[in-house]
Amino acid sequence: MLIVNRFRWAACQLDALENCLNYKMLQNALASLPKTLDETYARILHGIPEEHKQNAIRILQFLTYSEQPLRIEEAVDAIVVDVEADQHFDPKYRMPNPHDILYYCSSLVVLVSAKDHSYNEDDKIVQLQLAHSSIREYLTSNRLDNNIAQNFQEIAAKASIATVCLAYLLHLDVELPTKEIRQRFPLAQYSARYWITYAAVAESKDETLQGFITEFFCCHRSSYRNCYNLYRPDQPWDDEPAKRGEEPASALYYASFGGLINAVKYLLSQGADVNAQGGFYSNALQAASGAGHDKIVELLLSKGADVNAQGGQYGNALQAALGAGHDKIVELLLSKGARSYIV
């Protein structure tokens, strides 16, 4: 690892020296080269122009915590999102040349050609990636300056990513075929797939994110339908859920499955039907039981969820918890009258 880091350090210095236009600039640069990889990354981050900093941080947050590599088109749309504006996304603000996205993060990111395994019809795609694994390690360490570190703490970064994804999905409050959404809005599939994963980590800590979750679940039916026609988190193997013609399940169901306890509390306070049918697990209680969210299971039961409700993949909540090995939930359901078999 030490040798690899030295090569990485040398590569960064060569990148810095490329900007020297004459001998004097070269001398000055050589005299002030950082001695370690940490110092090198710190200098690169501090050297990002102020007008580029917001976009650079967002790109680095996505790449540091992303569940999968970002296509360049996804990254371009991610930095267009304005979570504070009335119109969260406007395509006219996309970069004319997507490859220019490299300028935001200097030596920290690279473009890589990769095989496409998604919905793009082309054989090859271009992905934006961190230039080296040591960058992720540095950004998630305790060695950053405080004013930068706060952006890369897990909860803050994942709250930011989830909010961007939800803001993007809220823009899709129109009736469009799923195929057209994927073609016109490159970040839509990623947002639909991952927003709830990021939100589950940060929901209870970030009021802005809570507001976006509430708006998404309660106020924009087309955005909601488009999201779950792109991806159903309870059926991740299904690439085309919309083709089966089944309507998405209730907001309470997906919030329960995703572990969003604050959203579950809010939806119940607004009169959501705790026993509503729909989804792979048939109801919110079975979804939460199968996913292992014991606090949500307890909450749903306290609000009148039928502990022996039938339906779904496992038949009932107890079987879902047993099948997934969630012993604490099994004990909880049994204590609330769940029957081990139903006649």
Language-model regions: role of each:
Residues 5-276, 287:
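Leucine/isoleucine-rich amphipathic helices and adjacent mixed helix/strand linkers
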Residues 251-252, 283-288, 316-321:
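Ankyrin-repeat helix-start
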Residues 265-273, 298-306, 331-339:
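Ankyrin repeat domain, specifically the short helix-to-loop turn at the C-terminus of the second helix
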Residues 274-277, 307-310, 342-343:
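Ankyrin repeat boundary signal
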Residues 318-323, 327-343:
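Leucine-rich solenoid repeat scaffolds
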